[in-house]
Amino acid sequence: MIARRMLRFTRDRQRVEELVHDCFVEAYLSLRSYRGDSPLEHWLSKIATRVGYRHWKTQRRDRQRMVQLQSVPPRSSAPATASDASELAGYLLDQLSPRDRLAITLLHLEGRSVPEAAELAGWSQTMMKVQAHRARKKLRALLEKQGIHHE
């Protein structure tokens, strides 16, 4: 369960293992805060979401320090294959801020409800809705920049 969640935050298998380890270390250190009023799986899922979110923030900060991201050449049409689409989706998600990326991942990639996504992120439902709206708007702009227009 935790490893599957971490795959949403990185595709690097070795990094997934490190993030899973970080989740369990954080869970162990936070064990006193577990109240038992919700399933342990839910509590661990919340910790995993926060660990993944911090990973994105750190990754983005490190990238900005080292080099500017290279831009993908504009496309004249939609991606031809599933592999192209997956590559483009990964590139577009990398362009979003960690907050935007978290909202998109929880709501659209994992298919969670707004209340559930908000709880996992530690945000209010209103904040989740606003963040998701802004993230979708940014994704549309990035798609148009790549020459792919939303219908």
Predicted regions, residues:
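Helix-turn-helix DNA-binding module
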Residues: D94-L102, E110-M127, K138
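C-terminal flanking helix
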Residues: A3, F24, S97, R101, ...
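Short amphipathic helical patch at the helix-1/turn junction of helix-turn-helix
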Residues: L7, L107-L109, H133
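Short alpha-helical "packing" element that flanks the helix-turn-helix/winged-helix DNA-binding module
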Residues: A89, A103-I104
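C-terminal edge and immediately downstream basic/flexible tail or linker adjoining helix-turn-helix-like DNA-binding
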Residues: Q64-S71, S76, T81-A82, Y91-L92, ...
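Amphipathic, Lys/Arg- and hydrophobic-enriched alpha-helical face
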Residues: M1-R13, S30, S45, L93, ...
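Arg/Lys-rich amphipathic alpha helix in sigma70-family domain 2
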Residues: L29-G36, K46-V67, A82
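Structural recognition of an alpha-helix C-terminal capping motif at a helix-to-coil junction
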Residues: E18-V25, S38-R50
